[in-house]
């Protein structure tokens, strides 16, 4: 996802309020744990993108930020919402550097849930874990991990160890944890 961002002033609440009123989202780009730049993201463009995104996929989405003539590859590390309207009011981006490891959550998608044997026998499919915490290089980031649940019967489970994890991803979450279960109703 490409975003054109602009520079902004720092630390004054009145300026942040004005940015939000004029259709912007205040944001910060971090690199190596330190603040790299204070920026403004177009709220309409980001909101439109966010509404088209699958649930949980934001954490593994790589953004190309066009900032002062250069392109910065980054992940969203934190997002703040307004309590009553659920409007995005602040973003934190983490710059991706090619040779540096990054920690992130990769969403887990259950595929073939409609054809699940346990569901056809009257069971209820419940996904317990929706994302796996991993460490990897930026080039190894995948949009999601898939778990085939077609053969899952009644009272059976699938663990993180059952997911085909691509080379380059090193799980932080213990692989013995249950991802999905089919229980009797």
From Swiss-Prot:
Keywords: Ribonucleoprotein, Ribosomal protein, RNA-binding, rRNA-binding
InterPro entries: Rbsml_bL25/Gln-tRNA_synth_N, Ribosomal_bL25/Gln-tRNA_synth, Ribosomal_bL25_b-dom, Ribosomal_bL25_C, Ribosomal_bL25_long, Ribosomal_L25_dom, Ribosomal_uL5_bac-type
Gene3D superfamilies: Ribosomal protein L25, beta domain, Ribosomal Protein L25, Chain P
Gene Ontology cellular-component terms listed: cytosolic large ribosomal subunit
One Gene Ontology MF term: 5S rRNA binding
Presence of keyword Ribonucleoprotein: yes
A GO BP entry: translation
Pfam families: Ribosomal_L25p, Ribosomal_TL5_C
Keyword ATP-binding: no
Family indicated by similarity: Belongs to the bacterial ribosomal protein bL25 family. CTC subfamily.
PANTHER family: RIBOSOMAL PROTEIN L25/GLN-TRNA SYNTHETASE, ANTI-CODON-BINDING DOMAIN-CONTAINING PROTEIN (PTHR33284), RIBOSOMAL PROTEIN L25_GLN-TRNA SYNTHETASE, ANTI-CODON-BINDING DOMAIN-CONTAINING PROTEIN (PTHR33284:SF1)
Subunit structure: Part of the 50S ribosomal subunit; part of the 5S rRNA/L5/L18/L25 subcomplex. Contacts the 5S rRNA. Binds to the 5S rRNA independently of L5 and L18.
Function text: This is one of the proteins that binds to the 5S RNA in the ribosome where it forms part of the central protuberance.
Name of the protein in question: Large ribosomal subunit protein bL25
Taxon lineage: Bacteria, Pseudomonadati, Chlamydiota, Chlamydiia, Chlamydiales
Name of the gene this protein is made from: rplY
């Amino acid at each position: 996802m490409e975003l054109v961002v602009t520079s902004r002033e720092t630390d004054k609440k009145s300026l942040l309020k004005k940015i939000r009123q004029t259709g912007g989202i205040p944001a910060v780009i971090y690199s190596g744990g330190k603040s790299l730049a204070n920026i403004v993201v177009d709220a309409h463009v980001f909101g439109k993108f966010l509404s088209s995104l699958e649930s949980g996929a934001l954490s593994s989405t790589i953004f190309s930020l066009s900032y002062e003539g250069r392109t910065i590859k980054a992940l969203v590390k934190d997002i703040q919402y307004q309590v009553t309207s659920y409007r995005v009011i602040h973003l934190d981006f983490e710059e991706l550097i090619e040779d540096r490891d990054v920690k992130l959550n990769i969403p887990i998608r259950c595929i073939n849930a409609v054809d699940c044997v346990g569901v056809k026998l009257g069971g209820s499919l419940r996904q317990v874990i929706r994302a796996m915490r991993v460490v990897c290089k930026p080039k190894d980031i995948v949009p999601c991990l898939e778990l085939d649940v077609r053969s899952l019967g009644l009272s059976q489970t699938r663990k993180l160890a059952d997911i085909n994890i691509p080379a380059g991803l090193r799980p932080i979450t213990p692989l013995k944890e249950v991802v999905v279960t089919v229980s009797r109703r």
